[in-house]
UniProtKB/Swiss-Prot annotation:
Keywords: ATP-binding, Cell cycle, Cell division, DNA damage, DNA recombination, DNA repair, DNA replication, Ligase, Magnesium, Metal-binding, Nucleotide-binding. Its EC number is 6.5.1.1. Its cofactor is Mg(2+). The active site is at residue 220. DNA ligase that seals nicks in double-stranded DNA during DNA replication, DNA recombination and DNA repair. It comes from Nocardioides sp. (strain ATCC BAA-499 / JS614). The keyword DNA damage applies. InterPro entries: ATP-dep_DNA_ligase, DNA_ligae_ATP-dep_bac/arc, DNA_ligase_ATP-dep, DNA_ligase_ATP-dep_C, DNA_ligase_ATP-dep_cent, DNA_ligase_ATP-dep_CS, DNA_ligase_ATP-dep_N, DNA_ligase_N_sf. This is Probable DNA ligase. ATP binds at residues 218, 225, 240, 269, 302, 374, 380. Belongs to the ATP-dependent DNA ligase family. GO terms for molecular function: ATP binding; DNA binding; DNA ligase (ATP) activity; metal ion binding. NCBIfam families: dnl1, PRK03180.1. It catalyses: ATP + (deoxyribonucleotide)n-3'-hydroxyl + 5'-phospho-(deoxyribonucleotide)m = (deoxyribonucleotide)n+m + AMP + diphosphate.
């Protein structure tokens, strides 16, 4: 059944968003498009599809398509006729084939879809498949547009999306009103977006944000973020990107089932330890959670979001900590000290570093659990300054690096526009093993190339160490990193969680 909104409408909105740097104009364009998909007229399916598409994403997690499969397309249609629902149904058919004959079936479905699309629509469809739709419509902008279109408060939309795990999941509820959004609550077994920490250059700066009040200082473990849900015997273990990894971590499931409660939601880290109790290299923990085989991991928890029918998101961190202490034994809690004294905090940080950990996270004791938000309530402090950035492009190496992709172009999020801002390049910190891996990885993400540069889909997150930040007119963000070097690639982190250019600017002297 054809929907009222055409894919041409999405393409036009995408172009309008790309053409302006004004956040207000971007939000207005998104709101206008979403209003045309009002579910009270055309149903929730169309609205959810439009919401996903204006954010530059498909509703299917995987389609089996890559940019190489889109190099030979049929001639474009002379005029726009495709609805968003027809495109969604086409991608359902494209994603479905498996087994013998699946490639031919997928190719036929692709040819049928693209043959019905205009030249502009073909370009947009190719971009959304390959991740090139960079109109700056990040999720926060889509949420603002949804709130405006539905006439509901933005905080209500944000909260519901965080608890449901996506904006698409609550789009229809927004048009039903505040009561429907308020009915979206934490559901045991359905992961929520995790609370995130901002950065500070040192402990003094982190404690200053608390205004002299006592804070919790947690050890920052160098593991994989996990969220553990239990309802009776049923346990779900999810990553920070909400991927279900329960089957890969039976030892975490065992710990969860042993806790003295019927239902709960815990936030924490999974960490692989050496025989002396020190953390193993991060790559070993990451490999274990990704593949389900390898070294054993131990869960450590630092927060509780729900216990036996009671949601705890809105209670203070101090109250949640008391609940956590009653529920989880000390050997599975992240080490913590509560203090307002800088000397005590610095001594605790030194002890964490001696034990092989990354640093500390300073947490307000009065704050609620702000799912999906990065704010001043949690502040991480590490002796080595690091940023999580995204790779925008890579340059071919020379000399002994001939034939390898070497110099990576680094980008941060611009919260003002929703786009990505380049901060500089680096080829430092790369072993031969890393060079070989990233060459293969970035060729998989390639979208185009020039003589020396391979442009890639902005999907790969990299953790960068740096010595400082300086003002620069060379890059659009007005800042550049000094002595940037690769610490590691972070396959566990989605691009939505990379650092902002504002965070980078906070490190200016």
């Amino acid at each position: 059944m054809n929907g009222a909104v055409l894919i041409a409408d999405v393409v036009a909105t995408s172009a309008a968003i790309t053409a302006t740097r004004s956040r207000k104009a971007k939000v207005a364009a998104i709101a206008d498009l979403l209003a045309r998909a009002d579910p009270r007229r055309s149903g929730a399916d169309e609205l959810e599809t439009v919401t996903a598409y204006v954010g530059g994403a498909l509703r299917q997690r995987r389609t089996g398509l890559g940019w190489r499969g889109l190099t030979k397309l049929p001639a474009p249609a002379p005029g726009p006729t495709l609805s968003v629902l027809e495109v969604h149904e086409a991608f359902e058919r494209i994603a479905a084939p498996a087994g013998a004959g699946s490639q031919a079936a997928r190719a036929a479905a692709v040819a049928d879809l693209f043959g019905r699309a205009t030249a502009e629509e073909q370009q947009w469809l190719r971009g959304v498949v390959t991740g090139e739709v960079r109109q700056g419509a990040l999720d926060s902008l889509v949420q603002e547009g949804l709130a405006a279109a539905a006439g509901v408060p933005l905080p209500e939309v944000r909260r519901a999306a965080m608890l449901a795990g996506s904006t698409v999941a609550v789009a229809a509820a927004a048009f039903e009103g505040v009561a429907a959004l308020g009915a979206v609550g934490l559901q045991v077994g359905r992961p929520v977006l995790p609370m995130l920490a901002s950065s500070a250059p040192d402990l003094a700066a982190a404690l200053a944000r608390a205004g002299g009040d006592e804070v919790a200082v947690d050890t920052k473990l160098d593991g994989i973020r996990i969220q553990v849900h239990r309802s009776g015997p049923d346990v779900v273990v999810a990553t920070r990107s909400l991927e279900d990894i329960t089957a890969r971590l039976p030892e975490v499931v065992e710990v969860a089932r042993a806790l003295p409660a019927d239902s709960f939601v815990l936030d924490g880290e999974a960490l692989a330890l050496a025989e002396d109790g020190r953390p193993r290299p991060f790559q070993e923990t990451a490999a274990r959670t990704a593949m389900g085989a390898g070294v054993e991991v131990t869960p450590y928890f630092f927060d509780v979001l729900h216990l036996d029918g009671a949601d705890l998101l809105d209670v203070s961190a101090a109250e949640r900590a008391a609940v956590l202490e009653r529920l989880v034994p000390a050997e599975h809690r992240v080490p913590r000290v509560v203090t307002a004294d800088l000397g005590v905090a610095e001594e605790f940080l030194a002890g964490a570093l001696r034990s092989g950990h990354e640093g500390v996270v300073v947490k307000s004791l009065a704050a609620p659990y702000e799912a999906g938000r990065r704010g001043a309530s949690w502040v991480k402090v590490k002796p080595v300054h690091t940023l999580d950035l995204v790779v925008l492009a890579v340059e071919w190496g020379s000399g002994r690096r001939q034939g390898w992709l070497s110099n990576i172009h680094l980008g941060a999020r611009d919260p003002a526009t929703g786009g990505l801002v380049m901060l500089g390049k680096t080829f430092k910190g790369m072993t031969d093993e890393v060079l070989a891996w990233q060459t293969e990885r970035f060729l998989e993400l390639e979208t185009s190339r020039s003589a020396h540069v391979v442009h890639v889909r902005p999907e790969q997150v990299v953790e960068i160490a740096f010595d400082g930040v300086q003002r620069s007119t060379r890059y659009p963000g007005g800042v550049a990193l000094r002595f940037a070097r690769v610490l590691r690639y972070r396959d566990d982190k989605p691009v939505a969680e990379i650092d902002t250019v504002d965070t980078v600017r906070s490190f200016l002297g």
